[in-house]
Amino acid sequence: MEKVLRKVFHESERIEVESDLLGAARAVCQHQEGLACILGTGSNSCLYDGEKIIGNVPPLGYILGDEGSGAVLGKLFLNALFKGTLPDGMKEDFLQSSDLSYPEIIQRVYRQPMANRFLASTSLYISEHLDVPALRDLVKENFRDFFHKNIAQYVRHDLPVGAIGSIAYHYRDLLQEVAEEEGYKLSTVAKSPMEGLVAYHAY
């Protein structure tokens, strides 16, 4: 990757190729210690010392882990939808608005590629119906699991938490609520790391 980039940016003195997690950490924590999170289709987190990652709880992917992610939120939503624990009429409304049937959803999840992206796509419907308490509770449950199973493992309540990604960004108010309830300070939330990375490298 570095060789490819150097062909394009041949006048650059220095080219770094690092992980998306380090990019997220630098974007939200800059040169300070902190807990950095990615909350998008998948999820990840790390303990960051202001320069490098010094701790990482493995996210395990959407089947075994990825708490806080869009894929897991989709799993929670579809489970509640078809098991009848959401308000009356919501299942019919979702199926109509998504132009999907129950068999088609099962097909997309179990027999087609990129099931995680399909599951995460249900977030659009959820975000448009956040006036429904049951859906707000699902979003908060997803974030709470993320804090309990990932962030809490770093045992650093003293550090600020920063988050990158579409799920963090679109549900930032609920993420803020959960962070405070769990005893953390949410410092920065951004949809993309780009602006933060520009600031990091300009310093």
Spell out what each predicted region is.
Residues 3-9, 28-35, 76-203:
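ATP-binding/phosphotransfer module of carbohydrate and carboxylate kinases, centering on a glycine-rich
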Residues 1-89:
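Phosphate-binding/catalytic loop of phosphoryl-transfer enzymes
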